[in-house]
Amino acid sequence: MADYLISGGTGYVPEDGLTAQQLFANADGLTYNDFLILPGFIDFIADEVDLTSALTRKITLKTPLISSPMDTVTEADMAIAMALMGGIGFIHHNCTPEFQANEVRKVKKFEQGFITDPVVLSPSHTVGDVLEAKIQHGFSGIPITATGTMGSKLVGIVTSRDIDFLAEKDHTTLLSEVMTPRVELVVAPAGVTLKEANEILQRSKKGKLPIVNDQDELVAIIARTDLKKNRDYPLASKDSHKQLLCGAAVGTREDDKYRLDLLTQAGADVIVLDSSQGNSVYQIAMVHYIKQKYPHLQVIGGNVVTAAQAKNLIDAGVDGLRVGMGCGSICITQEVMACGRPQGTAVYKVAEYARRFGVPVIADGGIQTVGHVVKALALGASTVMMGSLLAATTEAPGEYFFSDGVRLKKYRGMGSLDAMEKSSSSQKRYFSEGDKVKIAQGVSGSIQDKGSIQKFVPYLIAGIQHGCQDIGAQSLSVLRSMMYSGELKFEKRTMSAQIEGGVHGLHSYEKRLY
C-alpha cells in the first residue's frame, strides 16, 4: 500500500482542467461538443438555482430561454407560451408588417392587469361583431359602452354565455338584446389597486371586472383568466403594465422603418435587427435611427461572432448582441459562404468583450440539448435562442403532417429558398434581395412532433438548474463569475470521449427525456 501514500497531508490538490481563457487560447474553433465542464461542490438543491438573467441592458428574464424569429418557430402562440414561462419570443418578419404587428398585439393583450385598451362595442353592434372579435383576439368577454369606445358610459357586457346557443341566423341580432345589462354587473371604482380589484373579482365569481369612474364611464377592465395565469405561471415575463413581454424582428432597409413604427405602436418591448452578418453600414444606420426616434426601445444587434464585429454595434448603441453565424441545424452559411465561427468560440469571445460595456449576449444557434444550453451560459451568454429545439411543438406555426406514420412539422432556415420565396424579408437578411441568382444559406426540412412546450420548457429549466448544481453555481451570475475568475474548469473532449459520453454498447434503447 506504500505506493498509494503521498506526503504532505490531505491539503494537496493538483491543478486540474483548463480555465475558459486557456481553453480558447489557441486558434482552434470549438463548439459545444468539443468540451465538458468539470464538476464542483454541491451545497444547495437544484430548485434553489436562480436562472434570472439579462436579455438587454434594461430587460431581465427569469428564464434564459428565447424563441428564434423564424417563420416556422415564433408567432403569437409561441411568444405567449415563452413569456408565460419566464422567457421571451421574437415574432418573425417573414410576413407583412401588419401581420407581424397584429401578432405582437395578441401577445400584449393576452395577459394583463388593468386592461386600459380592451375591445369595446356599442349596443348597436351585432352578435356577428362579437364573433369576429373572438376570432381576431381570442376572447369574447366584451364591455358594451354607449358609443362603443373607452371613456364612454358603461351599459353592459357580452360574454360567451350570452351568445353560446344562438343560431347562425341570430348573428345580426343587436347586442342591446343579448348583453348582460349594467344593473347586473359587478364593477370597481377608478383608483382601486390591482390587489383590491383582484379580490373583488374573486368574490364576484364573474369573468370580467369593469373599472368605472364617478360618471360610470369605462376606464379599464380586469379578466378572471389573468388571475389564473398569475397563479399558474409565477415566472411570467411582464412589463410595468403587467403585460407579457414580446420581441419582434426587423430588417435593416429603408422600408423596415414602416414595419418598426407598426411594431412599436403594437407594444413591442424589444427589437432584434435580423441579419446573418450584423457588422454592416445598414445595421449601424438602423441602430442610430431607432435610438433617435424611439430612445427607450431596447435594440438587439447581430448576428456577430467576433469582438471586432461586436465593437461597431456596441459603439452604435445596441442594448444586446446576438451571437452565431452558420451554426444552426438548418444553416449552411459556413458551407456556402466560407464565413462563420464554431459557436463555443464565438460565444466566449464576444461575451468576454461585450461584458466590459454591460451588453448581454444571446447564444443563437447550435443548441441541440439542455447540456448545450448550460455550456453556452457557462461561456458567458446571458440567454440562449432556440430554433430547432422549439420547432414542431404545438405552439410553433404550421400544420402537422404525416410521413411514413410519423407526425411532423416543417422547419426551415430563413436563408432557405423556401423562406426567401415567401417574402423579401428573408432575402434582405442575407443581403440578396437584389440578386438575380439567389444563394441559399439554409435548408428546409421537417421535425418530429415534440408536443407542447408547456412540458418541454420546464424540462429545459430543470436541466439547467441541475447542470448548475453539478457545477456548484447557485445562479447564472455566479456561473459567469466562476468562469471569468478561472474557478470554473473545462476539459477538451476527443472523438472517443464524445462517443463514451453518449449512449453506447446497447443493442437497442429508448431515450425519454421527460
Curated annotation (Swiss-Prot):
Residues of the CBS domain: 114-173, 179-237
Co-factor requirement: K(+)
Positions that bind K(+): 326, 328, 331, 500-502
Enzyme superclass (EC): oxidoreductase
Main location: cytoplasm
Keyword list, A-Z: CBS domain, Cytoplasm, GMP biosynthesis, Metal-binding, Methylation, NAD, Nucleus, Oxidoreductase, Phosphoprotein, Potassium, Purine biosynthesis, Repeat
Modified residues (Omega-N-methylarginine): 341, 355
Residues annotated for NAD(+) binding in this entry: 274-276, 324-326
Residues given in the record as IMP binding sites: 329, 364-366, 387-388, 411-415, 441
CDD domains: CBS_pair_IMPDH, IMPDH
Protein location: Cytoplasm; Nucleus
InterPro entries listed in its UniProt record: Aldolase_TIM (IPR013785), CBS_dom (IPR000644), IMP_DH (IPR005990), IMP_DH/GMP_Rdtase_CS (IPR015875), IMP_DH_GMPRt (IPR001093)
One GO term of the biological process aspect: purine nucleotide biosynthetic process
Positions of modified residues (Phosphoserine): 160
Reactions catalysed, as given in the entry: IMP + NAD(+) + H2O = XMP + NADH + H(+)
MF annotations from Gene Ontology: DNA binding; IMP dehydrogenase activity; metal ion binding; nucleic acid binding; nucleotide binding
Notes on activation and inhibition: Mycophenolic acid (MPA) is a non-competitive inhibitor that prevents formation of the closed enzyme conformation by binding to the same site as the amobile flap. In contrast, mizoribine monophosphate (MZP) is a competitive inhibitor that induces the closed conformation. MPA is a potent inhibitor of mammalian IMPDHs but a poor inhibitor of the bacterial enzymes. MZP is a more potent inhibitor of bacterial IMPDH.
PANTHER family from the UniProt entry: INOSINE-5'-MONOPHOSPHATE DEHYDROGENASE 1 (PTHR11911:SF74), INOSINE-5-MONOPHOSPHATE DEHYDROGENASE RELATED (PTHR11911)
Task of the protein: Catalyzes the conversion of inosine 5'-phosphate (IMP) to xanthosine 5'-phosphate (XMP), the first committed and rate-limiting step in the de novo synthesis of guanine nucleotides, and therefore plays an important role in the regulation of cell growth. Could also have a single-stranded nucleic acid-binding activity and could play a role in RNA and/or DNA metabolism. It may also have a role in the development of malignancy and the growth progression of some tumors.
Subunit structure, interactors included: Homotetramer.
Family (UniProt): Belongs to the IMPDH/GMPR family.
Protein name as catalogued: Inosine-5'-monophosphate dehydrogenase 1
